[in-house]
Amino acid sequence: CEINAWSGPFIMAAANTRVVRRTEALLGLRQESYGSNFTYQEHAFHQSWFSAFKSLIITGISVLVLMSPLKRAVKPFLPKPGEGPSKAVQENGWFDCKYIAETEDGEKSVFHMHGKGDPGYKVTSKLVSECALCLIEDAESLPGGFEYGGILTSAAGLGNPLIERLSKVGVNFEGPI
């Protein structure tokens, strides 16, 4: 139940961790909390220490450059709005996420989410589209009911109906949900 790899920073962790924590808070309001000791961390995994170290250095340099006056110097070399990966890159990309949940008594289980397609473009568009369709077509079966609303996360507001939709479009889920 362990992941035998080196860990390094993951570019989306800053946003994702906040979404997960907001979901936990929203579920707590419905008495469906993950538990009072819930924590969440996110990392990228690498096959070797060198790959993890290289990722750390590249991420660190990128953050420093983009948050300094050097940003103006590198901006002309960055992708412009509307530019992105080719259709072939979008089609041939993939993502593979493993989550390990550990209970207070030390019991662990693994949840796996994976799929084909560039996660930043193709998969994200699937996620957004299926969220919208879920709101329109599955409103009666959403967690909290039809009238539950506010500034929700996809997990708190759409729940299992969204998971079922995503499974039909190539976003695969394995393990306990």
Regions found by a protein language model. Give the residues of each.
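C-terminal catalytic/substrate-binding lobe primarily of soluble NAD(P)-dependent oxidoreductases
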Residues: 1-177
